[in-house]
Amino acid sequence: MQDKIMKFLAYDGKISVVCTSTTELVEEARKIHDLSPVATAAFGRLLTISAIMGNEMKSAKDKLTVQMKGNGPLGTMLVTADNFPRVKGYVANPVVDLPLNDMGKLDVGGAIGNAGFINVIKDIGLKEPYVGICPLISGEIAEDFAEYFAKSEQKNTAVALGVLVDKDGVKSAGGYIITPMPDATDEEISKIEQSIFKAGAISKMLDKNMTLLEIAKSVTGDENVKLIEENITPEYECDCSKEHMEDGLATLDKDVLKEMIEEDGKAELVCHFCNKKYEFSKEELEDILEKNKNN
């Protein structure tokens, strides 16, 4: 299935459902960062929820930054997204390897840790960006974001995220968020809770080649869900360039630039988000230093 985000309404418009498949996106990230299986599962979940949240923003100029920092060996994960959504990110320790957890699954919670925080920054063109911080609950990511939505955005939201990894890479990845509107009844919410439990893991549903419409019906228990938006394709895309890297070098102290020129005679910069390398010759560094002197 092609990566896609689809939006639905269930129970006559009283329940909002957003479903996404992100298998290709997560596999691309795995290759770029050479991620271990557990790092793939963790980073894939964060990329998926960030793609959903990024797409919820209104303007093409809006930007989302999501940082997740726990006390586990994975360290900090950071993802940025726009409303397209184009996402990119990095993992502090991409090669972390842990034994399977008690359920025989990749130990995402152990890799991230259960002490730490989620930091969400939304730059939506106001004077100051919106910042929401929420402590981690389990490190499993979906539970942590359900807590974030409840505490920071005052939305009771069911969140499911999953990445299925085998020896060849990512078999399936995706997620969904379900948000009741104020007029949703307790009976409808209860039916959804039961349906979510019965439906099982999102990664398993995608691996069975279920469509996003079928998944939306399955997790809500409503056969009459209404599709309201489709043809949204999340992508892993980095906008780095040599010009951006040069801007970064230009912010360095003059003495640091002089040291690079005198000791190394060149510089190599690597983009955190896509691992692309940029080479700067001695002459280019001298030009940057000269511009610095004139500023």
Sequence positions of predicted segments:
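Interaction interfaces in information-processing and related assembly proteins
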Residues: 1-229
